[in-house]
Amino acid sequence: METKTAKILDGKTLAEKIQKELTAQIIDAQAKIGRPPGLAVLMVGDNPASAAYVRNKEKSCAKVGIASFGKHFPQETTQTELEDVIAALNQDEQVDGILVQLPLPEHLDAVKLLHQIEPDKDADGLHPVNLGRLVRGEKGLRSCTPAGVMRLLAEYEISLRGKQAVVVGRSILVGKPMALMLLEADATVTIAHSRSQDLKSITQNADILIAAAGLPGLITADMVKPGAVVVDVGINRVSDAHGKSRLVGDINFASIAGVAEYITPVPGGIGPMTVALLLQNTVTSYLQTAKESGALDVK
């Protein structure tokens, strides 16, 4: 008897496709605007994982033609110092996107810092104004990870209209904006979280299951409806018996691949899409600013 295996939603390949599209857009626009798009990434301290993420973003920027303004601050940098830097970047005409790399040292207020970013330069799509635009169904910069999920589902022509969608996780980074974007696409949405009772009975009803709780292996095969679309947003670093670390998601990939219709891997699923949508947000801001200034014809 042939064993069924889920089709892979390949975020890495789609991210490369998006990067090529952005490169072409930038080449065309830069000839008229006279400068490339610019992304400022602010990092505080020496968290190795954060440093790796920042390097990856800078490398991706270079690949598509975005100027990267990396700013690395010592661990003891104060809230006021960072707010002053953000205020200057808000006024800098070379900068179209601003990103604060999380997590920050405990003495810093990340939410307050994010609020200082000019909404139209909010590359991560986390400013209250942009989240408010999402709630109202208005145009605005969208949170990168959930926007990446939506783009990946669209690429594979997975219909969401009328489907039962379950989001496991309620963070402002992923869970809440993810639920709103699914609602925008006419899905019927349930949000589950750490306080939800009988999580299994909730997830078993999902046609579309988004795991975004940050808990390795939380979702197992018996929690998944046969033929479901399972998207793993979790990025968790775990160590094996030999102390070697690796990245895993929130789902048990091997077992769920035998139940689901579509599945995303970790790594290579949503991670590359998050970076691609960060670049896209930066280019969107770049083009919008140019149109408003008259450097580009409004189309």
UniProtKB/Swiss-Prot annotation:
Belongs to the tetrahydrofolate dehydrogenase/cyclohydrolase family. The keyword Hydrolase applies. Catalyzes the oxidation of 5,10-methylenetetrahydrofolate to 5,10-methenyltetrahydrofolate and then the hydrolysis of 5,10-methenyltetrahydrofolate to 10-formyltetrahydrofolate. Homodimer. It comes from Nostoc sp. (strain PCC 7120 / SAG 25.82 / UTEX 2576). The keyword Metal-binding does not apply. It holds the Pfam family THF_DHG_CYH. Keywords: Amino-acid biosynthesis, Histidine biosynthesis, Hydrolase, Methionine biosynthesis, Multifunctional enzyme, NADP, One-carbon metabolism, Oxidoreductase, Purine biosynthesis. NADP(+) binds at G169, R170, S171, S194, I235. Pathway: One-carbon metabolism; tetrahydrofolate interconversion. This is Bifunctional protein FolD. GO terms for molecular function: methenyltetrahydrofolate cyclohydrolase activity; methylenetetrahydrofolate dehydrogenase (NADP+) activity. It comes from the Bacteria. PANTHER family: C-1-TETRAHYDROFOLATE SYNTHASE, CYTOPLASMIC (PTHR48099:SF5), C-1-TETRAHYDROFOLATE SYNTHASE, CYTOPLASMIC-RELATED (PTHR48099). PROSITE patterns: THF_DHG_CYH_2. NCBIfam families: PRK10792.1 (NF008058), PRK14186.1 (NF010783). Its EC number is 1.5.1.5, 3.5.4.9. One of its GO terms (cellular component) is cytosol.
